Design a protein with these regions (language model features):
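Membrane-interface extramembranous regions
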Residues: 1-122
Length: 122
């Protein structure tokens, strides 16, 4: 859970610190790329925080799973058009896709995890 929360905290902040980069990887068929970057950044930050609240963890994981699926086209776009991203070696672009699959698996595990047993009352 800490890995997923940290991933989305850093990624969400990145949407605002490196906005131009993230806008640049939005596929051309996605309308309003700047808005898409800002909105996804906000949802990443909200999801990262919500994962830390046990009562919200499963809902946050569901939201982050859907968000990650929605962002997959950006990673696919980079992988399919390496000439547009010459500073990224093709192997790194492929590794990003593998990492995204791993991340989806981690999020799915959070969605399916049983809730921790509540503390016994005294």
């Amino acid at each position: 859970m800490a890995f997923v929360s940290a991933w989305f905290l850093l990624g969400g902040l990145g949407h605002f610190v490196f906005t131009d980069f993230f806008v640049g990887i939005v596929p051309p068929y996605v309308p309003w790329p700047l808005a898409a970057v800002w909105v996804s950044g906000v949802f990443e930050l909200l999801g990262a925080a919500a994962l830390l609240v046990p009562a919200w963890r499963r809902l946050a994981a569901c939201g982050l799973f859907i968000l990650t699926l929605c962002m997959t086209p950006a990673n696919l776009y980079m992988w399919q058009h390496p000439d547009l991203f010459p500073s990224f070696p093709p192997t790194l672009l492929a590794a990003r896709l593998a990492l995204q699959a791993f991340l989806l698996g981690c999020i799915l595990a959070l969605m399916l995890a049983r809730d921790e047993a509540p503390l016994a009352r005294r």
